[in-house]
Swiss-Prot record:
The modification Phosphoserine is found at S217, S241, S309, S332, S333. The modification Omega-N-methylarginine is found at R230. GO terms for cellular component: centrosome; cytoplasm; cytosol; extracellular exosome; extracellular space. Changing A120V: In DEE88; decreased protein expression; increased levels of glutamate and glycerol-3-phosphate. The active site is at H187. The gene is MDH1. This is Malate dehydrogenase, cytoplasmic. Substrate binds at R92, R98, N131, R162. It comes from Homo sapiens. Keywords: Acetylation, Cytoplasm, Disease variant, Epilepsy, Methylation, NAD, Oxidoreductase, Phosphoprotein, Tricarboxylic acid cycle, Ubl conjugation. InterPro entries: L-lactate/malate_DH, Lactate/malate_DH_C, Lactate/malate_DH_N, Lactate_DH/Glyco_Ohase_4_C, Malate_DH_AS, Malate_DH_NAD-dep_euk, Malate_DH_type2, NAD(P)-bd_dom_sf. Its EC number is 1.1.1.37, 1.1.1.96.
Length: 334
């Protein structure tokens, strides 16, 4: 057995965490021979609920779970971390302006970034899930200057999986038969799900998705909007936001960071845009296609970008630039 790793989940009393914690504890993310110390952070009013989650994790009697720590204190939560999964954020309330939401979250992620900087290992991998995820991730990274910015990523894997699922449903195959879809940009309704480079396995042969579907207007229209608005559709139907699918996407994202991406496959994650070859401005936290090896991601380079894609990629970059500018205003005054 190897040494235990310390894994933090914030927003640990919430519903995404409730769907996530068992998978982390049972070895589905870090492997079946990796012991784990699981640290659960939430705000003080949620500590009663968090105690219940702690009891349940104990009652799962998971062999890999060496210890579970529930806390509302950042200095306890962020100490010596190997992995931080930042799920907790201020949710958008009815009638709340996006600006107010951004301001509340800048405060949270500035504080958590500073705690990472002060207490966590410098090699910590930080995954931001709480919305607005891209800008929250950038805020945390800027507030943790001693941790390499490449160690920060935000979740767009849920959008990636949603795109795969839509293509699979349309073609009557399983999602596993679809690979190399891309989510470009922000985890918002301006994201651009791109299948120009995606492949699907049909009768044992790999075929381009455009070629397989022969329905360009669906791919450029309804497919894009369905993926962009899927989160809202789930809320409308379930009266709660996606939790099971979000937790599964977090597991996929973190497992790929830990073990690498399969040969010939790439995935989508929000990462720092510095040095990309796709004309996205530097210093944005933008979702790109990446491959991962030895716990290090690299951009997938050299994919041809058509005019339709270019326009969509620029639009979401513009939104991220505006979000970043507002956040940085709050950051300097926070």
């Amino acid at each position: 057995m190897s040494e235990p790793i310390r894994v933090l989940v914030t927003g640990a009393a919430g519903q995404i965490a409730y769907s996530l914690l068992y998978s982390i504890g049972n070895g589905s993310v870090f492997g079946k021979d990796q012991p784990i110390i699981l640290v659960l952070l939430d705000i003080t009013p949620m500590m009663g609920v968090l105690d219940g989650v702690l009891m349940e994790l104990q009652d799962c009697a998971l062999p890999l779970l060496k210890d579970v720590i529930a806390t509302d204190k950042e200095d306890v939560a962020f100490k010596d971390l190997d992995v931080a999964i930042l799920v907790g954020s201020m949710p958008r309330r009815e009638g709340m302006e996006r600006k107010d939401l951004l301001k509340a979250n800048v405060k949270i992620f500035k504080s958590q970034g500073a705690a990472l900087d002060k207490y966590a290992k410098k090699s910590v991998k930080v995954i931001v899930v709480g919305n607005p995820a891209n800008t929250n991730c950038l805020t945390a990274s800027k507030s943790a200057p001693s941790i390499p910015k490449e160690n920060f990523s935000c979740l767009t894997r849920l959008d990636h999986n949603r795109a795969k699922a839509q293509i699979a449903l349309k073609l009557g195959v399983t999602a596993n038969d679809v690979k190399n879809v891309i989510i470009w940009g922000n985890h918002s309704s301006t994201q651009y799900p791109d299948v120009n480079h995606a492949k699907v396995k049909l009768q044992g042969k790999e075929v381009g998705v455009y070629e397989a579907l022969k329905d360009d207007s669906w791919l450029k229209g309804e497919f894009v909007t369905t993926v962009q608005q899927r989160g809202a559709a789930v809320i409308k139907a379930r009266k709660l936001s996606s939790a099971m699918s979000a937790a599964k996407a977090i597991c996929d994202h973190v497992r790929d960071i830990w073990f690498g991406t399969p040969e010939g496959e790439f995935v989508s994650m929000g990462v720092i845009s510095d040095g990309n070859s796709y004309g996205v401005p530097d210093d944005l936290l933008y979702s790109f296609p990446v491959v991962i090896k030895n716990k290090t991601w690299k951009f997938v380079e050299g994919l041809p970008i058509n005019d339709f894609s270019r326009e969509k990629m620029d639009l979401t970059a513009k939104e991220l630039t505006e979000e970043k500018e507002s956040a940085f205003e709050f950051l300097s005054s926070a």
